[in-house]
């Protein structure tokens, strides 16, 4: 899901055929396929920008809780703590943490769009068109059409990792049902292979 899905998607693309010995299939939920477009969406006026600022603040708070581990290091913590957006936080902290020159290099490396053709196991992605991290117009639909291994199921609504159903959504969510059906379809009758 979300960032974990970005990591898994990149792993699947990077290791291509070699993954077949380790995984039979994968499902990605609410993945930001294009980190540049996702960031652009989060910087739009209104709720997206509010969410962006809130999440940047959460990231800052998590660093403040362990700041003693970062003092006298490569970071200008006051500059990091003044970040108002996720992109600013990434530029000031994440890039330095992982050795990227800037957010553009980091986002180019992180995006899955442009790498789907390298994935060699069945993958189902579930995304909502109203996901502020991965809006419908940023989904790699054309690239997916050319892949024998990758499919994207989109819903009009669901937000980011939402997919709730009903007036009081206390039962399984839509994403739970899709995962269950997908897993059953992949593994039914194939357990002897494990």
Positions of the model-derived regions?
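Short beta-strand/loop motif that positions the catalytic acidic residue
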Residues: 119, 125-127, 131
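Hydrophobic/aromatic beta-strand patches that form the interior of the parallel beta-sheet core
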Residues: 27-29, 124-126, 153
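Short helix/loop capping segments that flank catalytic or ligand/cofactor-binding pockets
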Residues: 36-37, 134-135, 162-163
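Alpha/beta-hydrolase-fold enzymes
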Residues: 1-97
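Active-site nucleophile elbow and catalytic-triad environment of alpha/beta-hydrolase enzymes
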Residues: 92-115
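Conserved loop-alpha-helix segment in the C-terminal half of the alpha/beta-hydrolase fold
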Residues: 129, 133-150
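Catalytic active-site module of serine/aspartate enzymes centered on a nucleophile-bearing elbow/loop
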Residues: 156-194
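Short, conserved loop/helix-junction motifs that constitute active-site signature segments
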Residues: 20-21, 116-120, 143-147
């Amino acid at each position: 899901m979300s960032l974990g899905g970005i990591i898994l998607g990149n792993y699947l693309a990077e290791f291509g055929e070699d993954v077949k010995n380790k995984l039979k299939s994968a499902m990605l939920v609410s993945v930001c396929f294009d980190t540049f477009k996702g960031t652009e969406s989060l910087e739009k006026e209104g709720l997206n920008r509010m969410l962006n600022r809130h999440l940047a603040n959460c990231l800052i708070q998590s660093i403040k809780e362990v700041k003693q581990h970062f003092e006298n290091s490569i970071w200008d913590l006051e500059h990091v703590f003044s970040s108002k957006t996720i992109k600013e936080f990434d530029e000031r902290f994440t890039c330095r943490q992982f050795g990227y020159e800037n957010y553009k290099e980091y986002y180019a490396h992180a995006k899955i769009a442009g790498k789907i053709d390298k994935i060699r196991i069945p993958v189902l992605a579930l995304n909502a068109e109203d996901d502020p991290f991965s809006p419908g117009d940023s989904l790699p639909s054309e690239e997916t059409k050319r892949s024998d291994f990758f499919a994207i199921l989109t819903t009009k609504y669901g937000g980011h990792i939402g997919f709730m159903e009903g007036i009081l959504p206390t039962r399984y969510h839509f994403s739970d049902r899709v995962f269950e059906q997908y897993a059953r379809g992949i593994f039914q009758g194939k357990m002897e292979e494990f």
